[in-house]
């Protein structure tokens, strides 16, 4: 089951898969307007932010990026225990699924289009939704 979350900015919808099977479903059925978040180097939920049509990754307010990043960190078994976690994010259209990849595993069409941020401390109000 995919989980939907209300974003602090009403223009956006956040949704998430909690395991590799849900993540695989989201990879297969994403929209071009989706921004994908994941903990770098650790297993985690795939968090998606649905952008309004015509908006790009550069238009997303930093507060919204941090909100999605907190949700991503909170839903990583390893990442939620770490003080500093690197969160990577890119547009769904940049995700590449190659034959032989495990469920939930992705690559990128253009690694330069992958952005990152660091979550230093967990925000329980955001993470415990």
Report the location of each language-model feature.
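Glycine-rich, often proline-containing surface loops adjacent to acidic residues and nearby aromatics
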Residues: 42-50
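Helix-rich interaction surfaces within compact, conserved domain-sized segments
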Residues: 64-129
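Residues in well-ordered beta-strands of folded domains
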Residues: 4-6, 15-17, 38, 48, ...
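Short histidine-centered catalytic/ligand-binding loop motif
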Residues: 49-65
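Short glycine/proline-enriched loop/turn "hinge" motifs that connect secondary-structure elements
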Residues: 36-42
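Eukaryotic short linear interaction motifs
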Residues: 22-24, 46, 54-56, 96-98
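Short flexible coil/turn linkers enriched for glycine and charged/polar residues
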Residues: 8-10, 41, 81
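Long beta-strand-rich cores associated with HINT superfamily self-processing modules
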Residues: 1-31, 61
């Amino acid at each position: 089951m995919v989980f939907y979350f209300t974003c602090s900015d009403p223009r956006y919808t956040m949704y998430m898969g909690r395991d590799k099977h849900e993540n695989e479903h989201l990879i297969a059925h994403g929209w071009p307007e989706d921004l994908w978040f994941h903990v770098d180097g650790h297993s985690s939920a795939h968090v998606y932010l649905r952008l309004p049509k015509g908006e790009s990754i550069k238009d997303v307010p930093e507060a919204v990026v941090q909100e999605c990043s907190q949700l991503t960190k909170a839903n990583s078994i390893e990442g939620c225990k770490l003080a500093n976690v690197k969160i990577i994010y890119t547009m769904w259209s940049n995700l590449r699924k190659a034959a032989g990849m495990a469920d939930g595993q992705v690559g990128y069409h253009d690694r330069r289009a992958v952005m990152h941020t660091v979550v230093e401390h967990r925000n329980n109000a955001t993470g415990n939704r």
